[in-house]
């Protein structure tokens, strides 16, 4: 009798070797049920620090903690079997120095079982990326618009104009040279993101960047139409689940108030209309 084997996860090495004719499909995931639904369709699931805004209603990602990332990372790992799972390193968990970054990254990897971590930053973070990679922790880079630096950016705005274009390019090249297996490019002018993609030896993953990127990522709640407070231009909604959820809640509330739910078929031992026990 054969015993079914669990699906093998996509590895960071496999993602690094992806060619332009096989784009990387990535979405964020924060919970086990959503991870389970997305798993078969995604190469990469990112447990993003965007959960602070999407799940917890925070105004920015800055208050997110390592403990929060670990709890959601565990949930996504339990809910998925196939996709490579990356966990964001939150603000303040890696910027101090390489050793702080290693302690927190190692803890995230050990306690979640995820395949890699993602951190924001450019050339100033290259030594940190190298430090982690040399110690066996795969790293995704993140350049362009960096949400953890939202105050320094002057808000959530597209980057890559004028001298910024050269800086974003230099940042991406430094992170790739340091050993990142892929680099996320966020909120960057399309020609700049395209040029970076063509210049790097590793795949890029775009979000509000360019169709030329080696892959694309979006926040799953945006894709599903669940998060309506703010919709960036680069978001495409593939479903509108928000109104469906509201309709279901309204129908439930109506039946409870009308005392039509629960009905006999939803109860145990309650006589049916014909008098027989249910």
Curated annotation (Swiss-Prot):
GO terms for molecular function: 3-methyl-2-oxobutanoate hydroxymethyltransferase activity; magnesium ion binding. Binds 1 Mg(2+) ion per subunit. Keywords: Cytoplasm, Magnesium, Metal-binding, Pantothenate biosynthesis, Transferase. GO terms for biological process: pantothenate biosynthetic process. 3-methyl-2-oxobutanoate binds at residues 49-50, 88, 118. It is found in: Cytoplasm. The keyword Cell cycle does not apply. Its main location: cytoplasm. InterPro entries: Pantoate_hydroxy_MeTrfase, Pyrv/PenolPyrv_kinase-like_dom, Pyrv_kinase-like_dom_sf. Pathway: Cofactor biosynthesis; (R)-pantothenate biosynthesis; (R)-pantoate from 3-methyl-2-oxobutanoate: step 1/2. Its EC number is 2.1.2.11. Gene3D superfamilies: Phosphoenolpyruvate-binding domains (3.20.20.60). Its cofactor is Mg(2+). This is 3-methyl-2-oxobutanoate hydroxymethyltransferase. Homodecamer; pentamer of dimers. Belongs to the PanB family.
């Amino acid at each position: 009798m054969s015993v079914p084997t669990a699906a093998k996860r996509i590895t960071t090495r496999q993602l690094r070797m992806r060619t332009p004719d096989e784009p990387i499909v990535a979405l964020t995931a924060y919970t086990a049920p959503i991870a389970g639904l997305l798993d078969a369709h995604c190469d990469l699931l990112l447990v993003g620090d965007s959960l602070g805004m999407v799940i917890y209603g925070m105004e920015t990602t800055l208050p997110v903690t390592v403990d929060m990332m670990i709890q959601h990372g565990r949930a996504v790992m339990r809910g998925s079997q196939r996709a490579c799972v990356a966990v964001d390193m939150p603000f303040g968990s890696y910027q101090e120095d390489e050793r702080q970054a290693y302690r927190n990254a190692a803890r995230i990897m050990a306690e979640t079982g995820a395949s890699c971590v993602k951190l924001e930053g450019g050339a100033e973070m290259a030594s940190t990326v190298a430090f982690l990679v040399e110690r066996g922790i795969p790293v995704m880079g993140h350049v362009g618009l960096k949400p953890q630096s939202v105050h320094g950016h002057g808000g959530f705005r597209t980057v890559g104009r004028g001298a910024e274009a050269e800086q974003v390019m230099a940042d991406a090249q430094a992170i790739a040279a340091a050993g990142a297996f892929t680099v996320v490019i966020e909120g960057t002018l399309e020609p700049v993101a395209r040029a970076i993609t063509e210049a790097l030896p590793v795949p890029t993953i775009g979000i509000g960047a360019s169709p030329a990127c080696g892959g694309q990522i979006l926040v799953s709640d945006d894709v599903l139409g669940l998060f309506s407070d703010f919709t960036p231009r680069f978001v495409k909604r593939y479903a509108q689940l928000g109104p469906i959820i509201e309709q279901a809640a309204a129908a439930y509330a109506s039946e409870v108030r009308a005392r039509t739910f629960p009905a006999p078929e939803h109860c145990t031992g309650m006589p049916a209309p014909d008098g027989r026990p249910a």
